[in-house]
């Protein structure tokens, strides 16, 4: 895997003061992903970690179709106040790895009655196309071998097992009428622990 690491910069946020680095990943077929790591000044032996895949509609625009924006905010708040410190790894894998353009097309199919997994399949994609290999490199860079992982996704736990000893912590946010069916599909078809 080829990647490069930016310089470290301060990142004051509404949740607290953090530091940040970007990992530029050179993927297959000349793809380029610029991931962001937001972390506390001190990282203890077992930091609190959230692996968060980009969701422009939820994270930036506050879409109620998913739980992403709420999970991002809750994770940042918990990391900021965790005694062992922590980090949020923001992976540029929009739409569970299918990209923004295809995600919007999947949304259009959802408007016609397909669920989130069926919509991806109609577009020729699996239900989840994400890769977590870069996370292993990020953990190496920060000398992380044990983590408390904020996730409801068992696939993330399995994917990170080669890189660190993982203890899962749920991240539960309130549902709303727009995302209840979506959350049920994540539970039933993607195995999320909700």
Swiss-Prot record:
Transmembrane segments: none
Catalytic activity: GTP + 4 H2O = 2,5-diamino-6-hydroxy-4-(5-phosphoribosylamino)-pyrimidine + formate + 2 phosphate + 3 H(+)
UniProt key word Ribonucleoprotein: no
Keywords: GTP-binding, Hydrolase, Metal-binding, Nucleotide-binding, Riboflavin biosynthesis, Zinc
Protein's pathway: Cofactor biosynthesis; riboflavin biosynthesis; 5-amino-6-(D-ribitylamino)uracil from GTP: step 1/4
Enzyme class: hydrolase
Database matches in Gene3D superfamilies: GTP cyclohydrolase II (3.40.50.10990)
Top-level taxon of origin: Bacteria
Enzyme Commission number(s): 3.5.4.25
Active site (catalytic residues): 128, 130
One GO biological process term: riboflavin biosynthetic process
Cofactor note as given: Binds 1 zinc ion per subunit.
Annotated residues for binding of Zn(2+): 55, 66, 68
Listed GO MF terms: GTP binding; GTP cyclohydrolase II activity; zinc ion binding
Role according to the record: Catalyzes the conversion of GTP to 2,5-diamino-6-ribosylamino-4(3H)-pyrimidinone 5'-phosphate (DARP), formate and pyrophosphate.
Official protein name in the record: GTP cyclohydrolase-2
């Amino acid at each position: 895997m080829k990647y490069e690491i930016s310089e470290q910069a301060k990142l004051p946020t509404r949740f607290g003061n953090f530091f940040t680095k970007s990992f530029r990943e050179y993927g297959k077929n000349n793809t380029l992903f610029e991931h962001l790591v937001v972390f506390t000044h001190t990282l203890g032996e077992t930091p609190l970690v959230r692996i968060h895949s980009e969701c422009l509609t939820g994270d930036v625009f506050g879409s109620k179709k998913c739980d992403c924006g709420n999970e991002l905010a809750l994770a940042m708040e918990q990391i900021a106040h965790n005694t062992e410190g922590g980090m949020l790894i923001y992976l540029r894998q929009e739409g569970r790895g299918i990209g923004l353009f295809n995600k919007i097309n999947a949304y259009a199919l959802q408007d016609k009655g397909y669920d989130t997994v069926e919509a991806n399949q109609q577009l020729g994609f699996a239900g989840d196309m994400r890769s977590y290999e870069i996370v292993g490199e990020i953990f190496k860079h920060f000398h992380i071998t044990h983590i408390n992982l904020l996730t409801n996704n068992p696939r993330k736990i399995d994917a990170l097992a080669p890189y660190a000893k993982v203890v899962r912590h749920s991240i539960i946010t309130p549902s709303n009428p727009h995302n209840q069916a979506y959350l049920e599909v994540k539970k039933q078809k993607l195995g999320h622990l909700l």
